[in-house]
Amino acid sequence: KYATKYPKVWKIKKLQLFILHVHAPCVRILTKMCYCYYAQIGGKYMDKKAKIITVAGKGGVGKTSISASIVRLLVERYPDKKILAIDADPAVGLSVALGVDVKLTLDDIRMGIVDSVENGETKEALELLSEARFRIFDALVEMPGFAFLAIGRPESSGCYCKVNSYLKEVIGLLANSFDYVVIDGEAGIEQIQRRVMEKVTHLLLVTDQSKKGAQVVSTIKNVADELIAYDRIGVIVNRVTYPELADLITVPGVEILSFIPADSAFAANDIKGKSVLELPADSAVLTGVKDALQKIEIL
């Protein structure tokens, strides 16, 4: 699967598979070789900067639907580009919205490492981390036009900072193998910064038409200013039921990119259990998200 669409990533994967079957004392040397090989075969491929689009907002405003719509529009506009969808919400709603069957999450991999350590297994830490790095490729679900990665539920009690930091670094390396990365986050931005990555190119904040929703988005923006680095930011107002009152929605210091009316086609699609990929092309959600992406120079 990877050999055709991700030939350079596949070479790395084969090298890591080789590492896993080597005696532990050799792992450090071979891992360093892997890093060198990573840089060598990457060249221009790894130097390019992926466009990383993070979607955040108050719960219940259609954030996941917006994220799924972004993935669909990117796939349709850029069929020759590599697109990665990351579900950073423990509810794993993005997988449902995109029709993805998730078998393995990043947290499953993390807990596997933690369990090995707590059970007293003799594998060295570096060997365990190398194995985790390999298994992330197993967690990738390949869909028509895009790949999908689920982060999973939040960490359990206890501190495994080195493991979490390592996995976040691997996500960053993986993201740079793609042209576009769409991250569907939790209601806040803190979990994305702690569990996924600290720098994105585009931050899209989603709210409904309520005053409370706008206040939550404003708070998320202020927190994001301190926690993560981003190049562009904008707000999408979703499920607008009173368009004549649209001017009352303001978020200080942030441009409102699009007002999306309540979409009966989307509601019917959701009731039938269909994914966003099956929405009519002229649906209000897709039209509104497309307008927002054009304003923020993604499309």
What residues fall within each predicted segment?
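Phosphate-binding P-loop
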Residues: 46-50
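C-terminal boundary of histidine-terminating zinc-finger modules
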Residues: 272-282
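P-loop/Walker-type NTP enzyme "switch/lid" segment
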Residues: 90-172, 271
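Conserved catalytic-core segment of NTP-binding enzymes
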Residues: 162-262, 268
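Walker A/P-loop phosphate-binding motif and the immediately C-terminal alpha-helix
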Residues: 51-90
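Short hydrophobic alpha-helical segments enriched in small aliphatic residues
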Residues: 3, 22-27, 39
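Cationic, low-complexity basic patches in intrinsically disordered or flexible, solvent-exposed regions
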Residues: 2, 6, 15-17
